[in-house]
Amino acid sequence: DKNASRLNLSIVRVVCDGRSLHKVLAPTSFDAILLDVPCSATGVMRRTPDVKIIRRKSDINKFAALQSELLQSVWALLKPGGRLLYATCSVLPQENDAIVGSFLSTENTAHCMILPQKVGESTAYGQQVFPSVLGGDGLYYSLLGKPFL
């Protein structure tokens, strides 16, 4: 809501906190989900150097908890046979592989999918793109699949 106002966007409608989407939308509503979670923004420090000043170590744990809750919440909205792309603009493993790995260890209907095209360095559960000398941002992504029942 704040970002929509800041960007002067009138087409954005906030329905609820993403952690409550499973309460508002029907289960298995989506074939695919892009979950671009709030994060520390450590991958975009090149463009937003204030991140170095405003971020605290304790913020990372708060973001990680929120990321886990969001992933758990939206998983119920994914149809069997569906795919979920988990993404951050972070280069920190605590917000990336640690979140996906923890989720996979507790959610027996989830598995990592092989990405058809890979950009960045392979990690245990996804791909990490580091900020580039060519001017690109850092980011992480992992493709998760839900098998047909």
Residue ranges and their predicted role:
Residues 1-149:
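S-adenosylmethionine
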